[in-house]
Amino acid sequence: MFNSIRTKVLAGFSILIAVMMIYIVYVSISNANETNEIEGITEEELPILIANYELANSINAQIAAAQGYLLTGDSKYTETFYSYVDIASKNADFILSTSEADQFKPYYDQSVEWRSLIDKDVFQAYDPDNLAIAYQNLLVLEQRGNDISKGYETLAYSMRDQITTSGEHLVKVGKQNLWISINMGVILVILAI
């Protein structure tokens, strides 16, 4: 009889250990996947989202700087314009080094051309005695700049939606893991009895 009880106890503990090992492997794999997804969000997706928003704002600030220059002729506005060009270049370099470069490149190319046209057709065309040409050029280029800004915003919204979807997935997986943990705890208690 002693061997029989001993065998049953060993079998019970073996089952408990096996169930615990399966649970530990599942939790480890699940946590590793969640960690990878969170790292993807924080290290790539979120910075891309921010960079696209900053690029959209940069275009708008460049338009405002060009308008300020035409209104006053003060070179501080051209300096402001080019400081935003530098900010945009840093953000663009970052995005071009990511997986989103293909979607981003057309807007980037348009913005580079747009900035050179602002320089040539607005800043260099500026003549205090005849502002009409520079104003007309800016009106045309302002609309183009707004379109580029909206393109960057569209990319940002797309990335925002992607982050939201990833977040919803992480919440779902977290709830599943909680449910599994509770059930596993109940099963282990029952097996231990």
Set out the residue ranges of the language-model regions:
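Structural signal for membrane-spanning alpha-helices in multi-pass inner-membrane proteins
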Residues: I24-V27, G68, A192
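Amphipathic, well-ordered alpha-helical segments in soluble domains
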Residues: V27-S30, E34, S58-A61, A65, ...
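Polar/charged, Q/E/K-enriched amphipathic alpha-helical segments with strong coiled-coil propensity
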Residues: I38-I41, L71, T78, L96-Y157, ...
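Short, Lys/Arg-rich, polar N-terminal cytosolic tail immediately upstream
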Residues: M1-N3
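Alpha-helical segments in soluble extracytoplasmic regions
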Residues: S75-L96
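Cytosolic-side ends of inner-membrane transmembrane helices, especially those
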Residues: G12, I180, M184-I193
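Non-membrane, extended amphipathic alpha-helical rods used for dimerization/oligomeric scaffolding
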Residues: Y82, D93, E153, Y157-R160, ...
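Amphipathic alpha-helical segments and their boundaries
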Residues: I5-N60, I95-S111, G145, S166-G167, ...
